[in-house]
Amino acid sequence: MIDFRNRLIDVQEKTVKAQGYLILNQEEKANNLLKEAFKDVLVLAKSSSPIRKEALAVQALIEDNLTALNKIEDVKDPKLVFDFANSDFIPQHLIAFEDSLYYFNPYYKGIIRTSGDTLERINADYGFNLAAATSFGLALFSKPDKISFLKDGRLEPAFALELPKSDTVFIAMTSFKDSLYFLEKGTGMIIKYREPFFENADQPKYWIQAQEKKALGAKSLEVTGSVYVLADDNAIWEYRGGLLLDKTYLSVFPFPQKLAKITALPSLSGLAVLEPSQGRIILIDRQGSLIRQFRSEDFLNLKAVAFSKDGKFL
């Protein structure tokens, strides 16, 4: 009992010290100390703890402070744009292109387009796994190697990309300038294809230099000038010129558990990081510093996010 009491006093002292930092506008110091205190109090707030009631009160105080410091905006009632619950289509992916939103899944033959209150079905002979907005149309990829472009509302005939290996599987795709970038399943390797895009037009190139470290088991990919890869351990790897430049673990509260996807913010100013298991979207700048977090119960099991051109809506 005495040990539990002393540990709680230590947590309370850290909390008071952090409050002092806040008065002095030293938010980073306060944030770091409160995160430390929060980890300490979790053990004391367990059901078996003899001081659980007091520990829970301290935990709530710390959590309130961390919520404010970590720029969490709770979204109570996000506006419903379309409800696919009673249709024959279940969207698994979403992408914004020009002034429309496009929804697709690998089992639905075609793609759904919405603009305002208008819904349009664009038929195809196959479903799509990945998509990327480019200056020459919306690129749509169907495993293992088919790619086609949607231009002016018309889906052009698909053609086959040459794969680097016969057993290559792509799990993420993005675009930058005149190139498409693919993330290879399991290996963390990135394959780059350059314009023009037609069958066998460009030999696939492994973009990361051969001797450089790769994020094995990586889950997501984005390019904003640097190439960012979301690794299986929640680290974000930054590459430039085919070389590993940096590896970042997000220092945010709530502590990341299972980050799922990264996508570029408008004007390539940073990244949005999706964590559906905690119902949130984390916005960071290119250096990995926190911009803002959006949290909602409606974001649990979130699969994708898209932004308006001006960045005011998601």
Predicted stretch roles:
Residues 17-52, 95-96, 100-118:
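Amphipathic, non-membrane alpha-helical rod segments
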Residues 79-112, 125-130:
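Beta-strand-rich domains and repeat architectures in extracellular enzymes and scaffolds
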Residues 110-112, 148, 191, 237, ...:
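WD40 beta-propeller blade core
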Residues 85-93, 125-136, 166-178, 212-224, ...:
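Repeated scaffold domains used in trafficking and secretory/extracellular systems
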Residues 114-118, 151-154, 194-198, 239-244, ...:
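Short loop/turn segments that connect beta-strands within beta-propeller blades
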Residues 98, 103-107, 139-145, 174-175, ...:
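Conserved beta-strand positions in repeat-built beta-propeller and related beta-rich domains
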Residues 76-86, 117-124, 156-164, 199-214, ...:
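A short beta-strand motif characteristic of beta-propeller blades
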Residues 57-84:
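Alpha-helical linker/edge segments of TPR/alpha-solenoid repeat scaffolds
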